Amino acid sequence: MKKIALKNAARGTAFDYAGQSWILLENDDGRALCLSKDIIETRAFDEGNCNNFAVASSKEYLNGAYLDNLLEDVNGPNAFLTTELDLTTDDGLKDYGTCTVTIFLLTVDQYRRNRDVIPNADDWWWLSTAFSTKSNGYESLARLVNTDGTLNGNYACSGYYGLRP
């Protein structure tokens, strides 16, 4: 694949970076929101069955070992920028607030906004949005995307679904 300048690229453009294939979803003020073209691995949203991405084991993995491996393939730590991720739940509750991350799973809102340029995956994959919160009786259900692109949800401890940062 040839080199491209993301600031000039169209939404939906596929490109290779840091040893992976990515899809450009959004460009805004010199920042690009990208999604891995493929699921990187199958893993629980959270091994402790908590649907709050701010404390989820998947967030720790993506911003730990996974990010470290990506950084080995690029020039320096500024290759990936931090983001303030809005963790508003699917039913609109704001109990989980926001979290600052570098690598993350899309929110339901980001997914919906960019669905037209996101290709379906071969398996189901997690989003960072919770179904609802502990205060509303739902501390374990997290949202995910089916193979046909429709939204679903399941228990955060389920290890059958993919991570697609």
Indicate where each model-derived feature is located.
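Collagenous Gly-X-Y triple-helix signature in extracellular proteins
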Residues: M1-R164
